[in-house]
Amino acid sequence: MSTAGKVIKCKAAVLWEVKKPFSIEEVEVAPPKAHEVRIKMVAVGICRSDDHVVSGTLVTPLPAILGHEAAGIVEGVGEGVTTVKPGDKVIPLFTPQCGKCRVCKNPESNYCFKNDLSNPRGTMQDGTRRFTCGGKPIHHFLGISTFSQYTVVDENAVAKIDAASPLEKVCLIGCGFSTGYGPAVKVAKVTPGSTCAVFGLGGVGLSAVMGCKAAGAARIIAVDINKDKFAKAKELGATECINPQDYKKPIQEVLKEMTDGGVDFSFEVIGRLDTIMASLLCCHEACGTSVIVGVPPDSQNLSINPVLLLTGRTWKGAIFGGFKSKESVPKLVSDFMAKKFSLDALITNVLPFEKINEGFDLLRSGKSIRTILMF
């Protein structure tokens, strides 16, 4: 029986309040309106940013259905949708690409005005919601809410991908892989023969290591306080791995001594103010580039001495790896299918969707790189 144009009842993981587990609930998912797409989820990754919402360090309206790294199949489309059709394999995009705003028209930027990151409303782009639970409206997250068997997204927030692609792997291109790989190959534009430092060896940090290697870096120094992550980092391209706890000096001083005054490129993939500063300070004062990738807590600010930049350092930030999402995601999936990079090493656990809380426990314990939930 066709579900097109009808309300669908399905399972979703609802976060009712911060610092509480997810609750598996039956929710109602409304049909897509004009220029919207309803997707049946197949695979979804657990990302640290989702956990930042649970802990309260990343603020978004609650109750909500979180999740933003996923892949699925189009179930239905609203009036006027032209870029996807029912049956297409797709990846939802937490950074949309409307193609019309000033940012989308700028070839060097990707932070589309239609995003729900800067000032989270927890709604679709028209300001309304498509989820209810027991008659109560439930907020969206980053416009895509992938911790649900079905979700509704705007057409500018979904990309059609290769019909042969394995959704349980390419779902990582929806956030973790792209968010780490892009800062190296697209934002910093790492050069062949250069020296790089990557702070944080979770799924995104390891993807940054992969990006540095793909760009031809000669030295890739991986930094983490969890030595259990070093073997995987070396497998993916790190030439050296260091633990800040092994040194009496600040880690930036250690790195400067190792690299004749500082690295060419550094990447902070944790989201802590102290490591953001260490990442900046470890890059060469005259020619280094440092990129902020990790999401810092909403309420914290940094103060810096302007001389740190005056001497010639470049300090950048990257959302979704600097990639224009709707046009870049299909290309990244094609590159994966062409074996230009592998995602297997990033996936350490696969669980049924109902075990979402167990998946978050694995993340918090440092025992997983990426856990994939299967519907």
From Swiss-Prot:
Other remarks on record? There are 7 different ADH's isozymes in human: three belongs to class-I: ADH1A, ADH1B, and ADH1C, one to class-II: ADH4, one to class-III: ADH5, one to class-IV: ADH7 and one to class-V: ADH6.
Question: What does the cofactor section's free text say about binding?
Answer: Binds 2 Zn(2+) ions per subunit.
Q: For Zn(2+) 1, which residues are the binding ones?
A: 47, 68, 175
Output this protein's name: Alcohol dehydrogenase 1C
Where does the source fall among the domains of life? Answer: Eukaryota
Query: What's the cofactor?
Result: Zn(2+)
Q: Which residues carry this modification: Phosphoserine?
A: 23
Q: Does the keyword field hold Acetylation?
A: yes
Residue span of the signal peptide, if any?
Answer: none
**PROSITE patterns, sorted:** ADH_ZINC (PS00059)
Q: Which UniProt keywords apply?
A: Acetylation, Cytoplasm, Metal-binding, NAD, Oxidoreductase, Phosphoprotein, Zinc
Which InterPro entries does the protein's record reference? ADH-like_C (IPR013149), ADH-like_N (IPR013154), ADH_Zn_CS (IPR002328), GroES-like_sf (IPR011032), NAD(P)-bd_dom_sf (IPR036291), PKS_ER (IPR020843)
Entry function = Alcohol dehydrogenase. Exhibits high activity for ethanol oxidation and plays a major role in ethanol catabolism.
Per the UniProt record, one Pfam family is ADH_zinc_N
**GO CC annotation:** cytosol
> Which Gene3D superfamilies did the record assign?
Medium-chain alcohol dehydrogenases, catalytic domain, NAD(P)-binding Rossmann-like Domain
**Localization annotation:** Cytoplasm
Q: Which reaction does it catalyse?
A: a primary alcohol + NAD(+) = an aldehyde + NADH + H(+); ethanol + NAD(+) = acetaldehyde + NADH + H(+)
By sequence similarity, the record places it as follows: Belongs to the zinc-containing alcohol dehydrogenase family.
Please list the residues that bind Zn(2+) 2. Answer: 98, 101, 104, 112
Q: What class of enzyme is it?
A: oxidoreductase
Q: EC number(s)?
A: 1.1.1.1
* Residue positions, PTM N-acetylserine: 2
